[in-house]
């Protein structure tokens, strides 16, 4: 099986989490003692602008189509990683941080997920680049595409590249993980040489990326592979949030600032990390959006399994004080072999049936 053609759906999310958290640790350590104590003892106002120290992200404006009011101290974010070859986002993770409940939920969105747009290629991984190529804000383009899937605008968004992930992990000393079996694969055409022995060990940045890209030897295919990726992410998160100091911390922060396209301020990052540090490992959960593959417009797509997705959406991502319903979404799904839309309109519907 060709493991190079499709990179890990989660590998860049590792780097995003590590980079964001590292920057926050630096800020937290640099705060004057009195200011740090004040930030911990009083939750910031939900509508307050970012300030020095720590600051909760600004909540996205609640639209008329959303189901209710925002819950206090609950924030949503989009983390994405770039595919250097195609120029599109290769990894998309939508998350919810509940500061009061001390819980973080992260949902992987397949890169080929169909979005209800009039594009030639209607995949969510095109949204960031399509917006930038049109002279618009790439982050807003990605946020808008995700809105149709989720029914709300994410409060914050960050996009980075694969090389940054490798460098960040190396600067922080690697990630300890119990590799379940020997991983060996060679592909000169794609400059891949994976040789990771089984067992508990410290993986460097390159090895972390290779582990998440490896696709052989899984009895249940992608189901087992995604399970391994989630185990790895939990191990990385557990190690990271337990750290009091990190070698080369300033260099990692500099790398994050120079390499990540984000609308998060440094104070926002510090606030979100403080939320993460207060979570136990069991309170950081990873999921994959329920989906099914299908061809449309002569291309292979991933379509949302609507009912299962609504259940997961309300359990893991809903930032409101009432459930999100399908009337709040704008997604295309398959029902009885037919394409349907929750909004009642499929943009350029003839496209779906084009061979």
Language model segments and positions:
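N-terminal Lys/Arg-rich, disordered targeting/topogenic segments
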Residues: 1-10
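Non-catalytic, solvent-exposed segments at the cell envelope interface
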Residues: 2, 15-16, 25-355
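Sec-dependent N-terminal signal peptides
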Residues: 9-21
